[in-house]
Amino acid sequence: MYVIQINKATKTYNNGTIAVHPTSLNFEPGTFNAILGPSGAGKSTLLRMINGLEIPTTGEIIIQGQTLTAKNLRQVRSRTAMVFQQFNLVGRLNVMTNILTGRLYYIPWWSSILYMFGQRDWKIAQWALNRVSLKEKAWERVDRLSGGQQQRVGVARALAQRPEVILADEPVASLDPIASEEIMELLREICRQDGITIVANLHQVSLALRYADRVIGLNKGRVVFDDSPQALSNNKNTLRTIYQREDGSVDDTLEMAVTD
């Protein structure tokens, strides 16, 4: 069974903008999938549809055999964790409390308001903290951490959900090159060792080629490439197809990719 199935899904906004044209994609369990494309290609919208943050205009999203609907949104979201470019952490709270918010799907609403977590939640959060090698930072305020450390907290929060899928929306775009490599290594390790499917929007082509099992190229809301990193690296014309603008010029990302 595929862990994610996208069946002819589209997204059109009220102003008539088509963010995603009819798209069908399947994702295997335990694979690392990178999505490339210029700004405005529909990458973030696609991830948000998978997580239920955006509702497809037409088509359907299926997670672990269950079609995403308004009625089962909370249940399905609990199995698809998000990692964000800007971390989406509460800076004034400590690391452990931020990680515990990954357990909010599993506790009553009144407990979530009071940040009342059970023993199992604490054990899972501690495991997630150790998994990202931040044990010594457990009680430190998040806003005192480096960018790379904050993203590790973001990954730990995602792990605390015990998800089948982690959706990473530009997870290293705000980080320096060394921290970027460390986060990508961590995500690949989680994919390999924990069997969690990773779907990551990336700006850096070189990282997609180095870490992904599969690369999907989007341009103007359409899938224009879907193959292995090796197939992409062997064909620079395909890179131009992915990053070509409407006026025929190419996105700056392509120039960086060619010189990587």
UniProtKB/Swiss-Prot annotation:
GO terms for molecular function: ABC-type phosphonate transporter activity; ATP binding; ATP hydrolysis activity. Residues 4-245 form the ABC transporter domain. The keyword Transport applies. Keywords: ATP-binding, Cell inner membrane, Cell membrane, Membrane, Nucleotide-binding, Phosphonate transport, Translocase, Transport. Pfam families: ABC_tran. It is an enzyme of class 7 (translocase). Its main location: membrane. It comes from the Bacteria. It is found in: Cell inner membrane. PROSITE patterns: ABC_TRANSPORTER_1, ABC_TRANSPORTER_2, PHNC. InterPro entries: AAA+_ATPase (IPR003593), ABC_transporter-like_ATP-bd (IPR003439), ABC_transporter-like_CS (IPR017871), ABC_transpr_PhnC (IPR012693), MetN_ABC_transporter-like (IPR050086), P-loop_NTPase (IPR027417). The complex is composed of two ATP-binding proteins (PhnC), two transmembrane proteins (PhnE) and a solute-binding protein (PhnD). Part of the ABC transporter complex PhnCDE involved in phosphonates import. Responsible for energy coupling to the transport system. Belongs to the ABC transporter superfamily. Phosphonates importer (TC 3.A.1.9.1) family. This is Phosphonates import ATP-binding protein PhnC 2. The gene is phnC2.
